[in-house]
Amino acid sequence: MAPDIDNIWSSTTDAAESPVDERRILLKRAVGQKILVPSILSLMPAWPSQVHPAVDEVNTEIDKWLPTVNVAEKKKAKHRARGNYAFLTAVYYPYCKETERLVVIAKFLYWIFFWDDEIDTGGELTEDEEGTIQCCEETNKCVDDCLGPNPNYNPPPNSRGTVEMFYPILRDFRAGLGPVSTERLRLELHDYINGVAKQQKVRQGERLPDPWYHFKIRSDDVGVIPSITQNEYAMKFELPEYVRRHEAMEEIVQECTKLTVLLNDVLSLQKEFRDSQLENLVLLFMNRYNLSLQAAVDKVLDLIREHYAICVAAEKRLPWSEDDEKLNDDIREYVRGCQRLATGTAYWSYSCERYFKQTQVNDKWEVLLDLSYVE
């Protein structure tokens, strides 16, 4: 279980080595190692993975749309080659009612990766705190313009490309969501946008963060939570607010979010290490507890098992109706949507080359991660 984080910094701020030494020592301990990671999907056995049959059609529509987006061609090409977010959309929403809605969600996923890349390690705003604040303010304004009480779908003049492209995407979401879901999505997007800025401050800190603190802020503000609400858009239903705020549903959302963070940090470990992005839970556990790479990976895998079990148990406490089967169907679909955020992220990670090469994955879906530097 996670410890109390009230005093988490006490063990790191008194460390003898300098912040530079701390990072250098961690890099030296991990570099050159290889580790075989078991199938992440096997750790969530009751949650199957499917792919929407219209994935190729969505890809075709994305190919038509991308040239119209005001984002650097190099960035578009990189994400198109390595990401395949149309496929990610198809595993997140395998039963989406309309292909047109699936295309809108795919555009949203392209937006979130484009936008996050501006601020994440290696982006234009990675070291620019003032620029990041301005970017977040402009993006938050877009969210309120499109999803607030007085909708305005016209981006301000000279908007940055990632803000400009977001206006029509949110317009389409609003057209297909009920008022309760629209407001939920608005608030969740604000949490995500503000959370990215908060994570940037952590990365800019002199010392590596405590893993439990890092896990908490990422789980609180991670971008998958809006994608859960978008399942209501995909499946054409609106979950009543009392069901969404029921303690069991809150726990399922939180636990699936935590699962997504945990499994993503395992599967992205090789890429992030090679990018010298050390704010990864595996590496942070190595640093905090002086663990070997194997022990740190095992710790994260154990956390996946733990949070999966909590999530499965919570389903029994949901507010099932005795006489409204439509409501029960909507609850089941909402829960499946939460689960697919975890399984879909894993399935997609194995199926594209954003984090590692296909040649590193065997027929058991085990992946051999390689923490060597590659020019």
From Swiss-Prot:
GO BP term (any one): isoprenoid biosynthetic process
EC supergroup of this enzyme: lyase
Motif (D(D/E)XX(D/E) motif): 116-120
Ranges spanned by the short sequence motif NSE motif, renumbered to the chain: 264-272
Binding annotation for Mg(2+) 3: N264, S268
Subunit description: Homodimer.
UniProt-recorded name of the protein: Terpene cyclase braA
Organism: Annulohypoxylon truncatum
Gene name per UniProt: braA
